[in-house]
Amino acid sequence: MEKQKILFVSQEIYPYLPETEMSVIGRYLPQGIQEKKREIRAFMPRYGSINERRNQLHEVIRLSGMNIIIDDSDHSLLIKVASIQSGRMQVYFIDNEDFFHRKGILTDKDGKYYPDNDERAIFFARGVLETVKKLRWSPELVHCHGWITSLVPLYLKHAFKEDPLFAKSKVVYSV
């Protein structure tokens, strides 16, 4: 019998970001699912505060190179990957210099939300789904964790509804 395929899309995953309730869930929930003999792919944004060298992120050339258009502007999509050795789990990172190379995750140093967080969420959601398409991987369940992932279900229901890879995908959303 084939393993159930689960796409886990998270706003934060520990140890790549500081330990918070959200990042800890983002870290251990996918591992627990994988330990139950499910096939899981985890995605998160590649925020500027993530140290690529220390966390051993590297670009996946065959998945990178797409452009995503938002408001008539082209934005290059880079896909990076790293492993959490203790959990035997890979994490894919959606990267773009314009949207994610900032020290703050969602807010600036004064605690104000970035004015383009909506575009960042659009880019992230579309980047995840386009990458999954490029992988030719058909998830049975898509679990979205955190508000920056909230557009993924909308895209699945509307923009990707005719795509056979997502035809049978069910969605779970948690915050």
Report each predicted region and the residues it spans.
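Catalytic cores of nucleotide-sugar-dependent glycosyltransferases that transfer UDP/GDP/TDP-activated
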Residues: M1-V175
